[in-house]
Curated annotation (Swiss-Prot):
Biological role stated in the UniProt entry: Cell surface GPI-bound ligand for Eph receptors, a family of receptor tyrosine kinases which are crucial for migration, repulsion and adhesion during neuronal, vascular and epithelial development. Binds promiscuously Eph receptors residing on adjacent cells, leading to contact-dependent bidirectional signaling into neighboring cells. The signaling pathway downstream of the receptor is referred to as forward signaling while the signaling pathway downstream of the ephrin ligand is referred to as reverse signaling.
Domain Ephrin RBD: 30-169
Disulfide bonding pattern of the chain: C63-C110, C99-C158
Family listed: Belongs to the ephrin family.
InterPro entries: Cupredoxin, Ephrin, Ephrin-A_Ecto, Ephrin_CS, Ephrin_RBD
Gene Ontology CC entries for this record: plasma membrane; side of membrane
Name of the protein in question: Ephrin-A3
CDD domains noted in UniProt: Ephrin-A_Ectodomain
Tissues expressing the protein: Expressed in brain, skeletal muscle, spleen, thymus, prostate, testis, ovary, small intestine, and peripheral blood leukocytes.
Entry's localization field: Cell membrane
Annotated lipid attachment (GPI-anchor amidated glycine): G214
Length: 238
């Protein structure tokens, strides 16, 4: 019975609005980018690997995963054997170059390599504003850095990745950025001229378009039309 009010509400919502409701408060659906975080991913083992995303995109990090035999798709045992387990950090640029986790904070922990059915996945949404107090906010035109440290085998190499959030609006150096105002929004320096400022000129005042379905009588002519109709009814009745 609890689903009945929700179903009734959905039936009352116009069909063109349903895609907008599905997009959520951000107003746009983002793409998803997948990265398999393990030592067999050669991209993560070299400096400079960059994933480019847009605002509202998602980055899905898949942790190392093994089946009961110790071998999993896309993630073989690391150097020295054993299941790979990592702690992922978001760090500064220098922390990325030196693979120093102390210059950042812990983001996720891949500590379940034998999870049933599928690997553990963490998702990062590159949103401009976060609705959560602990949520991270990202800015267009900036780079963000992720590294990992092994929790068991210290001989595993540093894995790292750089994420670039596209794209920042270009502006000349030294100039203050001009905010983009919504349509029909006036800035603080806009002067509004009243009719007295035109001194005899005939300002172009926008007119309302007539209804396509037909025209309606003017309000001031309505009493006259009612009087004529009443007179005709009285005359015909007599």
């Amino acid at each position: 019975m609890a689903a009945a009010p929700l179903l009734l509400l959905l039936l009352l919502v116009p069909v063109p609005l349903l895609p907008l409701l599905a997009q959520g408060p951000g107003g746009a659906l983002g793409n998803r980018h997948a990265v398999y975080w393990n030592s067999s991913n050669q991209h993560l083992r070299r400096e400079g690997y960059t994933v480019q995303v847009n605002v509202n995109d998602y980055l899905d990090i898949y942790c190392p995963h093994y089946n009961s035999s110790g071998v999993g798709p896309g993630a073989g045992p690391g150097p020295g054997g054993g299941a790979e387990q990592y702690v992922l950090y978001m760090v500064s640029r220098n922390g990325y170059r030196t693979c120093n986790a102390s210059q950042g904070f812990k983001r996720w922990e891949c500590n379940r390599p034998h999870a049933p059915h599928s690997p553990i996945k963490f998702s990062e949404k590159f949103q401009r504003y976060s609705a959560f107090s602990l949520g991270y906010e990202f800015h267009a035109g900036h780079e963000y850095y992720y590294i990992s440290t092994p929790t068991h085998n210290l001989h595993w190499k540093c894995l790292r990745m750089k994420v670039f959030v596209c794209c920042a609006s270009t502006s000349h150096s030294g100039e203050k950025p001009v905010p983009t105002l919504p349509q029909f929004t006036m800035g603080p320096n806009v002067k509004i001229n009243v009719l007295e400022d035109f001194e005899g000129e005939n300002p172009q005042v926008p007119k309302l378009e007539k209804s396509i379905s037909g025209t309606s009588p003017k309000r001031e002519h309505l009493p006259l039309a009612v009087g004529i109709a009443f007179f005709l009814m009285t005359f015909l009745a007599s």
